[in-house]
Amino acid sequence: MSEKTFHKAQTIRAKASGVPSIVEAVQFHGVRITKNDALVKEVSELYRSKNLDELVHNSHLAARHLQEVGLMDNAVALIDTSPSSNEGYVVNFLVREPKSFTAGVKAGVSTNGDADVSLNAGKQSVGGRGEAINTQYTYTVKGDHCFNISAIKPFLGWQKYSNVSATLYRSLAHMPWNQSDVDENAAVLAYNGQLWNQKLLHQVKLNAIWRTLRATRDAAFSVREQAGHTLKFSLENAVAVDTRDRPILASRGILARFAQEYAGVFGDASFVKNTLDLQAAAPLPLGFILAASFQAKHLKGLGDREVHILDRCYLGGQQDVRGFGLNTIGVKADNSCLGGGASLAGVVHLYRPLIPPNMLFAHAFLASGSVASVHSKNLVQQLQDTQRVSAGFGLAFVFKSIFRLELNYTYPLKYVLGDSLLGGFHIGAGVNFL
């Protein structure tokens, strides 16, 4: 009996147009813990494929989706002809399930540019349907701590990208921009999904955060008078359109995201915050990439309560308006930054891929931003009158879609007396950059 030969789906796709197909079976090889009902939900659409070209396309979509929802670490679709029918096919998925338990240690750079060490552990596909539980502890060289534990449950189905998650975390951080420390204990429930035939991304979050602000002896009175315990319950709703080819340093596409946070039903915090993010990127001749980012925030207190200093708008640092101290743009009292009730920021970038081309880029930028006081009577005028501008050049390093690292020489071009200027070479690291 001759040995059966499998062929990768992409090798026959060019010849598949117009060839009728009937899927007689879908088989999985390498399954140990994944539940049968989860697999059926993921591949049921294959039986509706009308021709071989559609079957090849759908098989690859299914293999990719199995990995993206956390059911498999790796999945490859192989298509074989059926011995009992000329138009019959059998789809075989060669899969590798996630490890039952993972743990690791990694060193890196925090959002504020501080070196940190993270310990993480997790269990994937806990119940055989893509569920995951992860824990992480992070410590920075400046003494910040953060511990969190999260659980996520995907909704399975043909090309369905939605999930619910729950997170508990405790963090202790120093905020040098207003000379204080903050402790946070929080519980967050979130839903992530898609609307309008997967063209619109949708996220809803319910936050319950117990915060303790500890002002140092160097903090201004405006900070010290808000020290102590506060409780914030808030609801966040965000919608976005994202056509970028990758989320970190895209070479083409746009992102448009609008988010609104409402706090005030319970707790001490009472406000409405609106945030608009816009990003666009396009390739230029000679391999250059032109990109631009814009962000606008508006914060309005509800009732007679003043918006707490922890909830205000901040700008400054290596992730937005480079060349200025972290979160130091805006109204100040003595040596403490008090944040604001509105902010605008925009950055224009020019990139040139180096070697390796998808990871290392030459980078030049022009950034601008301003923050208006929470007590401002004319937000637009104050935002216009207090513009900060900086320019610079350097290198940008992107590791897959995990983080971005920048080394820039920055020069502040326009500033306000009393600003914390940081010209020269600086490192920025994180995920969300303007």
From Swiss-Prot:
Entry coiled-coil feature ranges: none
Keyword Transcription: no
Main location (coarse class): mitochondrion
Swiss-Prot/TrEMBL GO biological process terms: mitochondrial respiratory chain complex assembly; protein insertion into mitochondrial outer membrane
One matching Pfam family: Omp85
Keywords (A to Z) from UniProt: Membrane, Mitochondrion, Mitochondrion outer membrane, Transmembrane, Transmembrane beta strand
Family: Belongs to the SAM50/omp85 family.
Function according to Swiss-Prot or TrEMBL: May play a role in the maintenance of the structure of mitochondrial cristae.
Name of the protein in its database record: SAM50-like protein gop-3
Phylogenetic lineage: Eukaryota, Metazoa, Ecdysozoa, Nematoda, Chromadorea
